[in-house]
Amino acid sequence: MADNTPTTANDLLNDATQAAAKSPEEIAKENDLLPKLITHLDRHLIFPLLQFVGDQDDEPSPEITKAKFELLKKTNMTDYVASLHCEIEGVDEAPKEYANKRQEILQRLEIFGQESEKITDLLGREDVVTGLRSDKVANLEFLKKEHDVTIEMVNVLYDFGNFQYSCGNYGAAAELLYQFRVLSTDDDKVTAATWGKLACEILTGNWESAMEEVQKVKESIETKLFNKPLAQLHHRTWLIHWALFPFFNHEPARDVICDLFFSPAFINTIQTACPWILRYLTAAVITNRNRTRNTGQYQKQLKDIIRIVKQENYEYSDPVTDFIKALYLDFDFEEAQKKLSEAEEVLRSDFFLVAASENFVEAARHLISESYCKIHQRIDIKDLSARLGLNQDDGEKWIVNLIRDTRVDAKIDYKEGTVVMNHPPSSVYQQVIERTKGGFFRTQVLSAAVAK
């Protein structure tokens, strides 16, 4: 017999809550950006991302192994591709074609070595290098006259560098592409060599050199493509994705790339072509709270990211950007805590952000507490702890440290379990002055401009 008991509102609410609750794995899967990222990365740069996904599984994933095989089968990394083939097919020995291809690659390496030997030896000599100038045409003339160097010999450096890159010999490839770039006057090949060298520096973890190449690629986009806006948009989109590697792996790069992404041309590119990059820019701005000494710059970046998240919310959102929306646009502290919890799972499953997850959570808790304290005179420690995702004991310790570190004017009433904020009274006159100060300054500037 069917149960005819009527469904209550509480039953519906509980069912909805249970249905809405998602596991960490579901949250991570729903917010996986890998399909979007790989369309803007070279195949060699995609490999570390696949490796990261594979490392998260307890057992080797056949899907990841097949993806690696498909990714690298057209490269010269024959030995590794052969091992992947054996793993996929469950055999001990790879087909003979891999041994044949390996032999062909070794022969090509030997030929390239012979063809480039003269020019690489010359570029390794101090007396030759000191004779080079910034004028590439003059350099080629000098090398042709003094050492019988030809354009064909210079182009061999480019071809050899590409070949070494395909073999996975990134250090050797970087050196060859650098030498080619010093001498070549072929703009297209020089641009390609710069992208190639950037990839090499990323893959070898030479972050300072990678940042130099990021700047060179940026300059190339601005100068060589200045009259081709669509090409600029395309190249900037790719550079934004490649720059994520030093962005979160090299501390000194954080401020430089933040400034780059916030620049008008690049923030426009992000909003137009790749709004999912807002996850990384938002995470960088939030974590900058714990590392920057320039409070003014940090506040400006925070205001900018709030504005951009608001503009792009219809186009892109994830728990990281939703945290900003909940806290600064909706002023919903419960939703902010929920999104922070989800954002933590997203960061832990993101190749670029996994190392920043703890700093992000810590900085986000500071932002929640700062916003909460601004609008409350007396704060219940238990309530604030819950909003920060902490138990009462941990929350109390965290709040004590916050008051000590930020030197905020507040007292803890342990008996009542509350924090009493001492907000200095602000007169109506002072508020009017603060609000009109900026307008008065702008009026002065405009008046001066008109007077000229």
From Swiss-Prot:
Quaternary structure and partners: Component of the eukaryotic translation initiation factor 3 (eIF-3) complex.
PANTHER family per the UniProt record, alphabetical: EUKARYOTIC TRANSLATION INITIATION FACTOR 3 SUBUNIT E
GO biological process: formation of cytoplasmic translation initiation complex
Subcellular location: Cytoplasm
KW Cytoplasm (keyword) present: yes
Gene Ontology MF, one: translation initiation factor activity
Domain of life: Eukaryota
Domain PCI: 246-426
Keywords: Cytoplasm, Initiation factor, Protein biosynthesis
UniProt main location, coarse: cytoplasm
Role played: Component of the eukaryotic translation initiation factor 3 (eIF-3) complex, which is involved in protein synthesis of a specialized repertoire of mRNAs and, together with other initiation factors, stimulates binding of mRNA and methionyl-tRNAi to the 40S ribosome. The eIF-3 complex specifically targets and initiates translation of a subset of mRNAs involved in cell proliferation.
Family from the record: Belongs to the eIF-3 subunit E family.
PROSITE patterns: PCI (PS50250)
Pfam families tied to this protein: eIF3_N, EIF3E_C, PCI
UniProt source species: Botryotinia fuckeliana (strain B05.10) (Noble rot fungus)
Full protein name: Eukaryotic translation initiation factor 3 subunit E
GO cellular component, one term: eukaryotic 48S preinitiation complex
Region described as Disordered: spans on this chain: 1-23
Bias (Polar residues) ranges: 1-17
